[in-house]
Structures are given as structure tokens and as C-alpha cells.
Amino acid sequence: INLRDAVNGTISYSNEAGKIYQLKPNPAVLICRVRGLHLPEKHVTWRGEAIPGSLFDFALYFFHNYQALLAKGSGPYFYLPKTQSWQEAAWWSEVFSYAEDRFNLPRGTIKATLLIETLPAVFQMDEILHALRDHIVGLNCGRWDYIFSYIKTLKNYPDRVLPDRQAVTMDKPFLNAYSRLLIKTCHKRGAFAMGGMAAFIPSKDEERNNQVLNKVKADKSLEANNGHDGTWIAHPGLADTAMAVFNDILGSRKNQLEVMREQDAPITDDQLLEPCAGDSTEERMS
């Protein structure tokens, strides 16, 4: 319902103090993030089993909003999270193509950006782009879940233990290799390479807020200098900071598709799997 209201421009909220929140003119392009394929929708069953929550999310959003979106020059756009393999991407391509054919829409009307946030998927980016070639916009560095996937996948290997969370930053070799490989793979195929989430929240305390903004600037500078075409933020209060960094580096360019990372040595499996150095403390485990 909220997504429908956002598409129609009627979404609003009034808090207990009477303050009203509503959309400004020309809002950002709306992209629907469906649930991961592993999560069921228990309220809808098929042959006695719950259907995938992601399919439920896609069907509801697409069916109720595609006409309004197309009428205003936009379209049904999606983020696909938690992908493990190219076979998942191929399945989504079949779903999208079926929906387009069912409603007499041109191929490619439905577009998607896929998050590379699992350790298996980082080794299959070429295959994923190919599988979704009729619908793909780009790939995104879903780095926090990628770090979790690294920990979960390699949990039985003592030599792959990561240090405390604050030490696992995107400038560390294994994460920087992940970022550069995503850029190189996407741009080779003409797809956009989106940077990861800045998971910081602005603070009302000026000193604390300056620390947050400086961290965001450093993080986004690394992404933009690597060759990412855009990025994610967790709070609209960080939009101006992130945008200023990308505008400074991109200048008049709308993207960095020409950045092919040709100067890089081949990125190896060992680089993607090598943990970074740092302290592992009992305090951070609690």
C-alpha cells in the first residue's frame, strides 16, 4: 500500500505532534526491493506450500503499479537481494519475461539491479549479468551482507576469521578487490556498478555528526575513485555529502562506464578470500 501511494504521489504521514511528511515534487526514482528468494510468504500457498516471498512482492508491486509507472515515464524497477548463483538470476529473467509477455509489454520494460552480497555470487558476476541481460541495470556491492556471507561460508576455517567489525572496511584488500572486480565486470558488459551502503546515521551532536560525515566522505571517495557509478546511503541526511563526493570526481560525466580497471592485475580467488588483519576482542563478540 505504501509503495502504491508512493507511485501515485499520495503517500504522507502525520506524527503525534502534527508534523506532516509528504513527497516533494520530482522525487527520486522508486525501486522496489523484494525479499530474498529464501524467505517464504506464509499467507499465500501453492499446492500446500508457501510461495517465495520475493515472488509475492514482485507480483503485487508489478501488477498494481506498472501502468502508473509507465504513464509517468518511469517503470517497474527492482532490487534483487541475497542472490547465490546465476541460476537464480536466470529464474528471475524468466519471471520478468513472462510478466512482460502476459501484459503485452516490450522486452526489457522490467529492469533490475542485483546485489552481489554473497560469497558464491561474487565468483559468478559474468554469468549473472548474462542471465539477466534483457533486464539488468547493474550490480551493487551489498557489502554488509557480503561480509556476513564471508563469515558464514568460511566459519569452519580458523585462518579465515575476520577481526572486529570496525576494522573490516572497504579499503581492506579483500573488500577492495571485491569492489574493483564488480566494477571491472559490470563496465565490461555495459552495466552500472553501484557502491555499497553507508550505514551511518546523522547525529544531532555536532562533533559526532562531523565524524559521521567524514567517514561517509572517505567511504564514498574510495568508491568513486575505484570507478563506481553511484552509491547507497542509509539516511537521506547523507545524500548531499555522498552526492558532493561523486559530483567532484565525476564532474560532468553521468557515470563511469569508461573506467575498465585495465591497470589492475587479475583479481584472484585468493585475494577475494584473504581475511584482513585486525584485533578480535571478546568485547566485540558480545
Question: Which residues does each PLM region occupy?
Answer:
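Conserved alpha/beta-domain cores
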Residues: 1-286
